Amino acid sequence: MEITFLGTSSGVPTRSRNVSSVALRLPQRAEVWLFDCGEGTQHQLLRSDVKISQITRIFITHMHGDHIYGLMGLLASCGLAGNAQDIEIYGPPDLIDYLKACAKYSQVKLSHRVRVYGVRPGILYEDEEFTVSCGLLKHRIPAFGYRIAEKNRPGRFDVEKATALGIPPGPIYGQLKRGEVVTLPDGRRINGKDLCGETETGRKVIYCTDTVFCDGAVELAQDGDVLIHEATFAHQDAQLAFDRLHSTSTMAAQVALIAGVKQLIMTHFSPRYAPGNVLQLDDLLAEAKAIFANTILARDFMTYEVPRLRRKTE
């Protein structure tokens, strides 16, 4: 799992930061899942090493323009490029009407199938590898955070050890790989866990924006490996955050601390903290690290690989 930040500014783009979009790359299945799609996202994709042709799912947090204005353009470009990949889009219920209006008035004809789902808190998608769920955040309009949870993978099955024990190949290997206890024809009972290496613990990535500090974000982020959380304002501008229902750097850090995440990555920064101003992003980082040490600042085109943990099968 690799996270690539395509836009890390709030509200408007700057010379060094585009508006919101994050790509979650899943190399093992040659897929990219996109989170938010602000204006100019397709340009950012072209400047990165993320392949547009691998986008299969797009998750939209809310209907503010800096999170959706690039969506129809990206879909249209995918169609013109002849991408055969179907795309599933998840977002607030109003997203369906927005896309229909864009398609109607710009007369876009998509050559690939696009499915749009209005979300509600709970599980949105599940397959053999991942579960994606969402929760309601606290913003001026309905906004949803997303949690991507990878399922645990069994450790490597030791075929050589199984052969040495005289276990015949066949369907029984599948049972042992799943950690089941199997009785052999000769009466021996074999615990599959004894033949498997360390379990690969599933990783969890959480994306929370736009929101002021809220219990919904804490609940969604519980025990996460990586929390991507907005930090629009510095702590001294907390009143602005409360007025506009955005987060400060310290609010993001508090969510990370209470939720027990391993890594906090802050994003969605106000342009008021650009270089040359009295307060700068390094100040926001220092504020957050005073509360939660494992904090870093996102920047456009930064890639973060989510580490995998292994634990011994019991």
From Swiss-Prot:
Enzyme type, top EC level: hydrolase
Keyword Zinc belongs to the record: yes
CDD domains: RNaseZ_ZiPD-like_MBL-fold (cd07717)
Pfam families: Lactamase_B_2
Entry's cofactor comment: Binds 2 Zn(2+) ions.
EC annotation from Swiss-Prot or TrEMBL: 3.1.26.11
Catalytic machinery residues: 66
Entry cofactors: Zn(2+)
Domain of life: Bacteria
GO terms, molecular function: 3'-tRNA processing endoribonuclease activity; zinc ion binding
Sites where the protein binds Zn(2+) 2: 66-67, 210, 268
Protein's UniProt keywords contain tRNA processing: yes
Binding site for Zn(2+) 1: 62, 64, 139, 210
Catalytic activity: Endonucleolytic cleavage of RNA, removing extra 3' nucleotides from tRNA precursor, generating 3' termini of tRNAs. A 3'-hydroxy group is left at the tRNA terminus and a 5'-phosphoryl group is left at the trailer molecule
Subunit: Homodimer.
Function: Zinc phosphodiesterase, which displays some tRNA 3'-processing endonuclease activity. Probably involved in tRNA maturation, by removing a 3'-trailer from precursor tRNA.
NCBIfam families: PRK00055.1-3, RNase_Z
Family membership noted in the UniProt record: Belongs to the RNase Z family.
HAMAP family with a match to the protein in the record: RNase_Z_BN
Protein name (Swiss-Prot/TrEMBL): Ribonuclease Z
Species of the source: Rippkaea orientalis (strain PCC 8801 / RF-1) (Cyanothece sp. (strain PCC 8801))
Name of the gene this protein is made from: rnz
